[in-house]
Regions:
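Conserved P-loop NTPase
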Residues: 26-34, 40, 105-171
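Substrate-engagement module of ASCE P-loop NTPases
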Residues: 55-76, 80, 96-107
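Short hinge/gating elements
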Residues: 44-51, 82-83, 156-160, 171
Length: 171
């Protein structure tokens, strides 16, 4: 309700079995966007090892990727990160997917940066800046304006400089 999505065509489910997920998604119209959170907890009964192992993560991701290619659905595989920002658990999925994106920012800050580490279809040196509002995440179309608005005018020892993040100039 807070995000204004009460009537949106969104369905939620809680499941970690890839076979059950694919079976459910195959019933009726296939969703255009599927979010799996998190790939490290998925498991498939085609592999005899514990969830989270390299074998399970790879097999689960492969099954979901096959489903996406067969149906044309877009699947976002969420992977959690460690405290130092590395993808938690096995890193095999990075080599299987079309893009690896990270959402960076401190929990106490209202701004987040979306950064691309891999992108088969475009540049990896681009960023997106977003602001967490009461209505959810909103794109910051002019990050320079945002950064300059927080600047104290007349502060000794400060300067504005033009930098480049990807192809985007940032002040």
């Amino acid at each position: 309700e807070r995000l204004g999505l009460a009537d949106a065509p969104v369905q939620l489910a809680s499941e970690t079995s890839v076979e059950d997920i694919v079976s459910t998604l195959s019933e009726g119209a296939v969703p255009r966007l599927i979010v799996i959170d998190s790939i490290q907890t998925m498991w498939t009964d085609t592999v005899e090892s514990a969830p989270g192992t390299v074998t399970q993560v790879r097999a689960s991701a492969q099954a979901l990727i096959r489903f996406a290619k067969k149906t044309g659905a877009t699947i976002i595989l969420v992977g959690h990160v460690t405290k130092d920002g590395q993808i938690a658990g096995p890193r095999v999925v990075e080599h299987m997917v079309d893009a690896v994106l990270s959402f960076e920012g401190e929990g106490s800050q209202q701004f987040r940066i979306l950064r691309s580490a891999k992108n088969r279809f475009g540049a990896t040196d681009e960023i997106g800046v977003f602001e967490m509002t009461g209505l959810g995440l909103r794109e910051v179309t002019n990050p320079s304006e945002l950064f300059l608005s927080e600047r104290e005018l007349g502060s000794p020892g400060t300067a504005v400089f033009a930098g480049i993040e990807g192809t985007r100039p940032v002040l």
